[in-house]
Amino acid sequence: MAGKRLLEQRARVERERLYSPREALELLKELDGARFDETVEAHVHLNVDPRRADQMVRGTLMLPNGTGKTRRVAVFAVGEKAREAEEAGADIVGSEELAARIQNEGFMDFDVAVATPDQMSIVGRLGPILGPRGLMPNPKSGTVTMDVGRAVEEIKRGKVEYRVDRYGIIHTVLGKKSFDVDSLLENYFALREELVRARPAAVKGRYIKSVAFTTTMGPSVKVDPSVERE
C-alpha cells in the first residue's frame, strides 16, 4: 500500500521541473502522506570537495521555527555544570556512570550528546560507538562547551547541525509536514543564508548546485537553487 501511494505521489511531481521553494513545499503538503506527522527535509548539493580541508562545510544554526521534534539531550558533566545542564532541561546527565551505560549496556536513548571539555577523556573512549552515529560531541558544533546550559536550551529550541557528506551534500530537517508553508520556508531560507555565509573561500563558480525537498515517506521535489527569498 505504501509503495502504491509513493508511486501515485511521484506521478504528481514533474521530474524535470525546478519548483520554487514555496511551490515545492505546497506540493509536498498536498500529497497524501503517512499516518504520522512526517519530517520535511532539505538536501542541498554544494560545489565543494569534502576531501579537502579548506572545502569542508559544517556548522550549526537555529531554525527560526524549530524542527517540530523534541530532541533528547545527554550531557557529560559533573558538579555545578551537571546541575546547570539539568536545570536547562537535559534528559540525561552523568559522567563515568553514563559512559559505562553506553559502553556496557548499549544505552543510546538520546539524540544529541554534549560534554564539558574536562569530560572528553571519558567521552573519547566512546568514539567507536558515538562516532558512527554522529553523536560524538565536537567543539565545532558547540557540543563541547563549558556553557552546557545554553547548549541544551538551544538544542531544545531547534538548533541543528549540518555537515556535507562525502558527495558534498547537506542533509537537514526543515520541520514537520504539519508546519505551515511560511514556517517551512523561513527555516529553509535561514539554512540557505547560513550555507552561503559558510562558503569556503577556495570554492569557485556556482556554489549551490542543486536543492531537493522531500518528506519521510514522500517523493523528492527538485527546487530552484537560485531563489534567495520568496
From Swiss-Prot:
List the transmembrane segments: none
Q: Which CDD domains match?
A: Ribosomal_L1 (cd00403)
Q: Gene3D superfamilies from the entry?
A: 3.30.190.20, 3.40.50.790
Pfam families associated with the record: Ribosomal_L1
Is Hydrolase a UniProt keyword of this protein? Answer: no
Quote the cellular component terms of the Gene Ontology held in the record. Answer: large ribosomal subunit
Keywords assigned: Repressor, Ribonucleoprotein, Ribosomal protein, RNA-binding, rRNA-binding, Translation regulation, tRNA-binding
Instruction: State one molecular function term (GO).
Output: tRNA binding
HAMAP family xrefs? Ribosomal_uL1_B
- What does it do? Binds directly to 23S rRNA. The L1 stalk is quite mobile in the ribosome, and is involved in E site tRNA release. Protein L1 is also a translational repressor protein, it controls the translation of the L11 operon by binding to its mRNA.
Q: How does it assemble?
A: Part of the 50S ribosomal subunit.
Task: Output the PANTHER family linked to this UniProt entry.
Answer: 54S RIBOSOMAL PROTEIN L1, MITOCHONDRIAL, LARGE RIBOSOMAL SUBUNIT PROTEIN UL1M
> Which family does this protein fall into?
Belongs to the universal ribosomal protein uL1 family.
Task: Please give the name of this protein.
Answer: Large ribosomal subunit protein uL1
Q: Which organism is it from?
A: Rubrobacter xylanophilus (strain DSM 9941 / JCM 11954 / NBRC 16129 / PRD-1)
